[in-house]
Amino acid sequence: ACIWASDALYYNSGAVTHSSAYNYRANKMAAVIAEKIGEDPTPYREEAGKILRALNARLWLSDRGHWAEYQDYMGHRRLHESAGVWTIYHALDSEVADPFQAYQATRYVDTEIPHIPVRANGLEEKDYATIATTNWLPYSWSVNNVAFAEVMHTALAYFQAGRPEAGYK
């Protein structure tokens, strides 16, 4: 299983956080379904455990408090350390984060993802903002823009992380 995050993203066989998070959740749910229909859930639970351990060992950047976007499979096997918002919200939505990781990952969005102030006549003056999907340069359509579904899914991630006030803004 994988996702379509953008028509401008290409990962060359690497370890990708959002895809791995989806695969973790899929295996976790397959274990629940297997148990309900009388099948053995063990292979799915074991696979989910392996995926979660790999996510934390290979892609969690403890010094930065978020997951890497991906680790390249070839060459120097470098980590792409500037995650897009889809990496954060898919990880939280797929329940791969512990509470502290969830807090740290949303703090990454607070501090590293561009925020565009929202102001309007009649709107109370607060720190309302919308966000870009990444902090990547040079600008490329579809990987560094404001997409309402991405903004809403990121807001949901804040609620899932226990930070509803920040998610509302």
Predicted features and spans:
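Short intrinsically disordered, low-complexity coil segments enriched in acidic
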Residues: A1-W4, K169
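Catalytic cores of carbohydrate-active enzymes
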Residues: C2-I3, N12-H18, Y22-T111, H115-L123
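Composition- and surface-driven signal marking solvent-exposed, interaction-prone regions
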Residues: Q104-T106, P164-K169
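Generic long, charged, amphipathic alpha-helical segments
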Residues: N121-A147
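Short acidic (Asp/Glu) and glycine-rich catalytic loops that position anionic groups and cofactors
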Residues: G84-I88, A132-T134, E150
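C-terminal substrate/ligand-recognition segments
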Residues: L137-G167
